[in-house]
Amino acid sequence: MIERFTNASLKCPICNAPTALDGTKTLYCKGEKKHTYDISASGYINLASPKQCGGGDTKSAVKARSEFLDCGYYKPIADKIIELLMKYSNKSATVIDAGCGEGYYTTQIAKNVELAIGFDISKFAVEAAAKRAKREGIDNAEFCVASIFTMPIFNESADAVVNIFAPCVENEYFRVLKSGGILLVAHAGKEHLMGLKQTLYDSAYENDARADLPTDLELICEENLKYNIQVDKNANVMALFAMTPYYWRTSQNDAKKLDGLNSLKTEIDIIFSVYRKN
């Protein structure tokens, strides 16, 4: 598993030099100053710059989201991602999961491709992702703490980039994609989580169209996935709420409407947009 770090085209975030393994516990750069990066016991590596460290999801948020996703509510989303990757890329692909979080999607991608690389700015999320991969016996998924705005990987290193409910950084994705590579963006449709919003707000509203989708890549496919879920247990309801942007926009009075709510039926409405770098 550790050897995969040498196959991932990772570069030093400080001097941009190529990297190599020094034994099994350290990655070092081949630049003049030989910057070193320890590989954690969990199997991930921190390549975030000092200014970027400490950001992203908290440990408790990562734990709650992991438990929610492990219930299978979003399994159809993962299945659709794999379907589209296999249709527009191939099993020998190197795939970057930009904003990989706890690795729920990354590990499933890894089961179908040559190499999956997950980047996320939260060290708690990346640690959870690395532990998930170990737990599931996956040896072709590597995880790095790093910003998706400046990923520590060389130009044209990836056959595909997957962006799932994360900021869409077109210039950076264009840089790391090989010619002919694809970008797969999974984003909320108009009615996504409408049942949750109807519970929270007096006047529920449809989601706006996403404003940061690529303009310089060729759109080759767009598909819509819709289904309903019944979320059981208040902990799962609260975890779902915390995963959404509504969590940060909702007043305390409205948020209290979820207290003690042990069942929630809501819509899942996801748009999958596939772009190609020509």
Identify what each model region corresponds to:
Residues 122-124:
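Conserved SAM/SAH-binding beta-strand->alpha-helix loop
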Residues 7-8, 225-278:
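Conserved Class I S-adenosyl-L-methionine
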Residues 149-160:
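A short acidic, Gly/Pro-enriched loop at the edge of an enzyme's catalytic core
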Residues 181-191:
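Conserved beta-strand signature within the Rossmann-like core of class I S-adenosyl-L-methionine
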Residues 92-101:
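Conserved class I S-adenosyl-L-methionine
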Residues 1-55:
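N-terminal auxiliary segments of SAM/dcSAM-dependent transferases
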Residues 102-113:
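Conserved SAM-binding loop of SAM-dependent methyltransferases across substrates and taxa
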Residues 170-182:
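A short glycine-rich, Lys/Arg-flanked "PGG" loop and its adjoining helix->strand segment in the class I
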